[in-house]
Structure formats: C-alpha cells, structure tokens
Design a protein with these regions (language model features):
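Charged interaction scaffolds used for protein-protein
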Residues: 1-203
C-alpha cells in the first residue's frame, strides 16, 4: 500500500488516531492495521503482524503530489473534474467559500470542497439532476489522499492567484478616482482588510 492507494476516509481515520491522547502507541498501531488492511490484528500471528507493519512504512513518507486528471472513476461512478474557476457559477463559488470558512483546507473538509468541482459524467449543472451527497461519499471513500491533497492545493492556489489579480485591478481602479489624501488612506486601509478577509477566510 502507498499514499496513492489510501482513501481520504481511511487517511482521516488514521489521523484521528494520532489526535487521540488516550491511545497508547500499541493500540494506535493495531487500529492502523485494522483500518488499512481490514483485518483483525488480534488474530494475526507475529510474523503476519511484522509483514503488515512493514507495509505501513509509507506512512512515514511525504504524501506525493500527483497530476490532476480530467476524469476520475470513484467506485461505480465516473466524475469529470471542472478545473477552470472562470466557469464557476455563483452557487459553486458561494459553496466553495462557505466550505472554506467552515473547515478551511483541512482533510476532513476535502469531500465538501471537492464536491463543488466533481460532476457526474454527462451532467453540466451544479447540484442539478444528481445527488451531491453521493458525490461527497464517493470522494471520501474512493479518492486517494494523494489525489485529494493535490486537487485541493490546485484550487486553493488558483483561487488565491485569481483573487489577487482581481483585487489588484480593483485597487488600481479605486485609486484612479479623485479622492483627498485622507480618503485614499482610508480606502487603502479598508482594502487591506478586504484582501485579508477574502484570501484567508476564517482567520
């Protein structure tokens, strides 16, 4: 097993083990084996246990970046990844912003964030004629953590760059307007607040 085979759901389950201060290292190890390999670790022989531990070594490695694809087969369903933010509807943009405010870029929030951009093959209208909860379930259960991280990073970076360009253009237009020195100072101050609130929601 490796990062490109580990589902988003299982990654979050393992992450939760490390956030639990009451678990001993031994218990954490056994739970990891159960999550990753769907076996009962208490029934394993010692040599089998060692084999599973060896297979978990990838957890100590960095999650690799993977190339984004146009389509993804998740379970029984095929999804098209809509990568161009310029074609987002207002509804998509608002959902994306709200999901960022609610959970940021944390892996627990990836299924929500990415459901904005994953369309069942053949569908063109966001949230219409398909079950968006099914999309989130498929992302959670079948998209690898390596893919989820790479796709999320792409959209978060794309969003920041797009917003910076828009805000810089807006600032330029505002400062072309005849204003007193004090008014310009106030506008610049408010504009800085807008940039921070827009680029870093929830901070």
């Amino acid at each position: 097993m490796n990062w490109t085979e580990l589902s988003l759901k299982k990654y979050n389950e393992i992450k939760d083990l490390y956030l639990d201060p009451d678990l001993s290292d031994e218990d954490r190890l056994l739970y990891q084996i159960r999550i990753l390999f769907d076996v009962d670790p208490l029934k394993l022989k010692t040599n089998e246990l060692r084999n599973y531990i060896d297979k978990m070594k990838f957890l100590g490695e960095k999650v690799p970046k993977v190339k984004l694809k146009s389509t993804y087969k998740l379970g029984e369903n095929v999804y098209v990844l809509k990568k161009d933010l310029r074609n987002l509807t207002v509804a998509q943009w608002l959902d994306f912003q709200n999901f960022l405010k609610d959970g940021g870029g944390d892996s627990d929030n990836y299924a929500n964030l990415l459901s904005v951009f994953f369309f069942p093959k053949g569908e063109t209208e966001y949230g219409e004629n398909y079950d968006i909860e099914q999309v989130r379930s498929d992302i959670n259960n079948y998209l690898s953590i390596a893919e989820a991280m790479s796709i999320s990073s792409f959209f978060l970076l794309y969003r920041k760059i797009s917003l910076r360009l828009f805000l810089l253009y807006t600032k330029k237009q505002i400062l072309k307007t005849p204003l007193t020195k004090e008014q310009k100072k106030k506008v610049k101050k408010e504009f800085r607040k807008l940039i921070i609130a827009t680029l870093f929601p929830g901070d």
